[in-house]
């Protein structure tokens, strides 16, 4: 498979509303995605941005969390999230890629730790595929800093993502059977950092 770099640009405009010690925000964004799969068209999607924060639960992007421990500077939670990565050979324009197996989106479960300081926040998380599509897991270490600007909040971040070998094999590998059907070379990726 020809693997391209994912480019995601997110422009978010949100507002905050408070209700009994919980915070809810809603907004709209745009996501540009250059597909990692050859034969897919680049696309832009409008996406709703919904966030909910309470003392015990949160919903951030595609992740639901239950907070086990929280202090002024630390938060530890268990998480469940949606991993939207998928491949549908029927939607592909490339003849060889149409002969590969379908890869499904999945659900992930894991844990996250946030450490908050005045200069920003650090996130460390890990999650595993609970639907056994890939039997893989992913990890993240990132630094972010919300920057309120009136009713708009911009949150720049930088980080490192880890994908284990099973995750990469499922989403990006080409098995021997797929190679024979498609004429593409078999491919077995290892783990990766991005």
Label the predicted regions:
Residues 30-36, 54-56, 80-86, 117-119, ...:
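Transmembrane beta-strands of outer-membrane beta-barrel pores
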Residues 26-28, 50, 61, 76-80, ...:
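Membrane-embedded beta-strand positions of outer-membrane beta-barrel proteins
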């Amino acid at each position: 498979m020809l693997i391209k770099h994912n480019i995601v640009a997110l422009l978010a405009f949100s507002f905050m509303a408070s209700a009994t010690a919980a915070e809810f925000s809603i907004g709209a964004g745009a996501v540009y995605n250059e597909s990692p799969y050859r034969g897919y068209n680049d696309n832009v999607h409008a996406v709703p941005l919904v966030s909910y924060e309470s003392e015990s639960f949160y919903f951030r992007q595609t992740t639901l969390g239950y907070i086990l421990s929280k202090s002024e500077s630390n938060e530890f939670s268990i998480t469940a999230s949606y991993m939207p990565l998928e491949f549908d050979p029927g939607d592909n324009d490339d003849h060889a890629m149409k002969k590969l197996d379908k890869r499904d989106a999945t659900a992930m479960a894991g844990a996250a730790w946030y450490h908050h300081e005045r200069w920003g926040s650090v996130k460390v998380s890990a999650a595993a595929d609970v639907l056994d599509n890939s039997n893989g897991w992913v990890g993240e270490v990132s630094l972010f800093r919300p920057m309120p600007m009136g009713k708009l909040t911009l949150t720049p971040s930088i980080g490192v993502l880890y994908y284990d070998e099973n995750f990469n094999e499922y989403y990006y590998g080409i098995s021997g059977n797929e190679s024979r059907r498609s004429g593409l070379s078999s491919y077995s990726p290892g783990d990766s950092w991005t």
